[in-house]
Regions:
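Conserved cytosolic catalytic headpiece of P-type ATPases
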Residues: 1, 37, 233, 282-289, ...
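Conserved cytosolic catalytic loops of P-type ATPases
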Residues: 29-51, 55, 187, 216-311, ...
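Bilayer-spanning, highly hydrophobic alpha-helical transmembrane segments
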Residues: 94-104, 333-361, 372-381, 386-391, ...
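Signature of the cytosolic headpiece of P-type E1-E2 ATPases
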Residues: 101, 466, 475-587, 602
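Membrane-embedded alpha-helical bundles of multi-pass transporters
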Residues: 110-113, 145, 164, 399, ...
């Protein structure tokens, strides 16, 4: 059986590194698929553990010039510690490089002919390259040994050439002056390029860390220590890792629930909003379930640990979000192929630029050839391309997780905004999925209290799902009964009882007709009116007359009307599928402003209906409970599972809405639209940046206006390109998931069609 694991990667500096690691792992025997996420500094590997081990994977990555943190070596906290240490190290190097490169820049630009100026610049430049910029050269050499090239290669070659040329001219300036030429010095270019690229990576690192805040928030929901109750009743504080299934744990007011389990003692209220999205605390008594990361309110209670570690709902959510953030949108596959050849192509362009200037550069051919080739190497930026898609995906999926929208992969996130039709299962999706009594019309002149007790006696013995709603309604009214009698279930009709020699009936109209019981005209009118509203009418009668009409309905979810309005306002066709008859289905459609519905649909017909819409050329999303609708969910282009708490069907659909609020669907659509827009913007600017700046760096404008781009300006532009891409992606975090509705001219009644 294949395994899928996520590993933290050490040593990546650009998108080219990610491409090299992905290629190395993909070529390893036993690896099914490898996906490297440069933005998250991790890799998700699906592999056959009988053919390749974690150590083998680590060795493969090490041979490519990088390293992996194995699963047993890294907890999320450890990876975060490493990221913090790397950031602090980069921060120190950046400050040092900026301080030392500043005097080099000032002398090189404004006091280039001052006495001993070249030697002073050499003294400041050496530590910039050999101390603060040494990792560029080490990584470039390591990549060269493995036959690869990356962003560090471009930096090392460009600054190395500029420095060595300047060093030669400092030591032997007469080589040029004897030939009537000036011995040009480019220490400022080498030093400032290193400093600016370090500054760019520092800003990029800070921005990238913000894309992972959703994961850090989820991880932070689990406490580090718990209180375990020993067999003798004493309390013991233990680390969360030591908790085993079967342990009895104590939760005090304000504590976070450490693992999933069931209450064994005590009563309290728990804030489960992070799981269910519902703001109202849930009462917990003996036997009820509690979930990791939820927050206890006022009371204390004990519970038995049932699911720990990776088995908890919180762990499943974290794993799903991590895998989704590491997944790749279809457009990223093209970007990966470009990134893999980008650095070699840039080196080739730089070489051609050098040769071209040497051939046609005139008196200053060598100087211009060196300057332009170095500028080409410096300005080219595969990082902007490599970060364009994954940063937007990470932020988008993280934003979804914060809004109770769990998105399983990048493809679903990208596809959702293209959806043209949304198919909703009525029960449990549009409605609460739990029938309730909305009205009881009692026949005047009867003994109301006795009749209610008889009704409770009969319904409390019935196994029909609607009977539970009647029992709940009567008990909430304070009705109790000690009546005794006979009880009989009548298939397809209802139930019959005998109490104190009197026959009573609860059921449908057919039950009345079979026993010769007629309805009064007013009762018939009430029943017909309720049926037209899509409600179910249950009759309660004795042997002579109808005692009451019990009206039962499956309540609409509070946000259903608004959610459907929002989707239809965006031009999305919304279809309701239901097993109800046409009259009931039409009434439901009218009540929520739905334009399209299909009645009398069997569960097996739902997938066929989705297929029909797809055959019409529509991109279809299906929303259901994730279990009964699994076939239709599998058929849909985008599958959405509605659920909450322990009912979350994470593995069923591509998108799982933890909250039961239907408004999460248009929210998810808006999030998809924002993310795809950010991806397109990022890719556009990344491609335009390279397409325009590389020719500029090569000196394409020199023949017409004498313009040559300074390598230092090129370094600043390169750093800015990466930072701007990440910053643009982070705009998704700042945006609220809002909707603009310009034409909300809905006719809630009569504006529908049956399909």
């Amino acid at each position: 059986m294949n395994e899928k694991k996520s590993f933290y990667v050490i040593g990546m500096s650009c998108a080219g590194c990610a491409a090299n690691i992905q290629q190395a792992l993909s070529e390893r025997k036993g690896v099914i698929e490898a996906r490297v996420n440069f933005a998250a500094s991790d890799v998700i590997v699906e592999y056959n553990p009988t053919l390749v081990s974690d150590k083998d994977l680590q060795k493969t990555v090490q041979e490519a010039g990088y390293d992996l943190l194995l699963e047993n070596e890294t907890e999320p906290e450890q990876a975060e510690i490493l990221q913090r240490e790397a950031y602090d190290k980069l921060h120190r190097k950046t400050i040092g490089a900026l301080l030392l490169s500043l005097p080099v820049f000032v002398i090189g630009m404004f006091f280039m002919h001052m006495p001993y100026g070249n030697w002073i610049m050499l003294g400041f430049t050496l530590p910039v390259l050999l101390v603060f910029g040494r990792d560029f050269f080490i990584n470039a050499w390591r990549q060269l040994k493995h036959g690869h090239a990356n962003m560090d290669t471009l930096v090392a070659v460009s600054t190395g050439v500029a420095f060595l040329f300047s060093l030669f001219n400092t030591l032997w300036p007469t080589y040029w002056t004897d030939r009537g030429l000036e011995a040009h010095i480019y220490y400022e270019a080498a030093a400032v390029i290193i400093a600016l690229i370090l500054l760019g990576r520092l800003l990029e690192s800070r921005a990238k860390s913000n894309t992972s805040t959703a994961i850090r928030k989820l991880i932070g929901l689990q406490p580090k220590e718990v209180i375990r109750i020993l067999e003798d009743g004493t309390e013991q504080v233990i680390p969360i890792k030591a908790v085993q299934p079967g342990d009895i744990l104590l939760v005090k007011p304000g504590d976070k629930i450490p693992v999933d389990g069931s209450v064994t003692e005590g009563v309290s209220f728990v804030d489960e909003s992070m799981i269910t999205g519902e703001p109202v605390p849930v009462e917990k008594v003996t036997g009820t379930h509690v979930y990791t990361g939820t927050i206890n309110q006022k009371g204390s209670f004990k519970f038995m640990a049932e699911k720990v570690g990776s088995e908890t709902i919180l762990a499943q959510i974290i794993k799903m979000v991590q895998e989704a953030q590491g997944s790749k949108a279809p457009v990223q596959q093209l970007v990966d192929r470009i990134a893999a050849i980008f650095v070699p192509a840039v080196i080739g362009i730089a070489a051609l630029t050098f040769i071209g200037w040497m051939i046609a550069g005139g008196e200053l051919a060598f100087t211009h050839a060196l300057l332009t080739s170095v500028t080409v190497l410096v300005i080219a930026c595969p990082c902007a391309l490599g970060l364009a898609t994954p940063t937007a995906i990470m932020v988008g999926i993280g934003k979804g997780a914060e809004n109770n929208i769990l998105i399983r992969d990048a493809q679903s996130l990208e596809q959702l905004c293209k959806v043209q039709a949304v198919v909703l299962d009525k029960t449990g999706t549009i409605t609460e999925g739990k029938p309730v009594v909305t009205d009881i019309f009692w026949n005047p002149g009867i003994d109301l209290r006795h009749s209610m007790e008889v009704l409770l006696f009969m319904e409390s013995r019935s196994e029909h799902p609607l009977a539970d709603a009647v029992v709940l309604h009567l008990t909430e009214e304070g009705i109790k009964t000690n009546l005794k009698g006979e009880f009989n279930s009548l298939t397809g009709q209802g139930i019959q009882g005998m109490i104190n020699g009197e026959s009573y009936f609860v059921g449908n109209r057919r039950l009345l007709e079979m026993n010769g019981i007629s309805r009064e005209s007013k009762q018939a009118e009430q029943a017909d009116a309720c049926s037209l509203e899509g409600k179910t009418v249950v009759y309660f009668a004795d042997s002579k007359q109808v005692l009451a009409l019990i009206v039962i309905a499956d309540r609409m979810k509070p946000g259903a009307v608004k959610a459907i309005e929002r989707l239809q306002a965006e031009g999305i066709e919304v279809y309701m599928l239901t097993g109800d008859n046409r009259i009931t289905a039409r009434a439901v459609a009218d009540s929520i402003g739905l334009k399209h519905f299909k009645a009398e649909v069997m569960p097996s017909d739902k997938a066929d209906f989705v297929k029909e819409l797809q055959q019409q050329g529509k991109i279809v999303a299906m929303a259901g409970d994730g279990i009964n609708d699994s076939q239709a969910l599998a058929q849909a282009d985008v599958s959405i599972a509605m659920g909450k708490g322990s009912d979350i069907a994470i593995d069923v659909a591509k998108i799982t809405l933890i909250t039961s609020d239907l408004n999460a669907i248009p929210k998810a659509w808006a999030l998809s639209k924002q993310t795809v827009a950010a991806i397109r913007q990022n890719l556009f600017w990344a491609f335009i940046y390279n397409l325009i700046d590389i020719p500029l760096a090569a000196g394409i404008l020199y023949p017409c206006c004498g313009f040559l781009l300074n390598p230092m300006i090129a370094a600043a532009a390169m750093a800015f390109s990466s930072v701007s891409v990440v910053t643009n992606s982070l705009r998704i975090k700042a945006k609220k998931i809002l909707f603009q509705f310009l034409n909300l001219n809905f006719q809630l009644l009569g504006n529908h069609s049956e399909v």
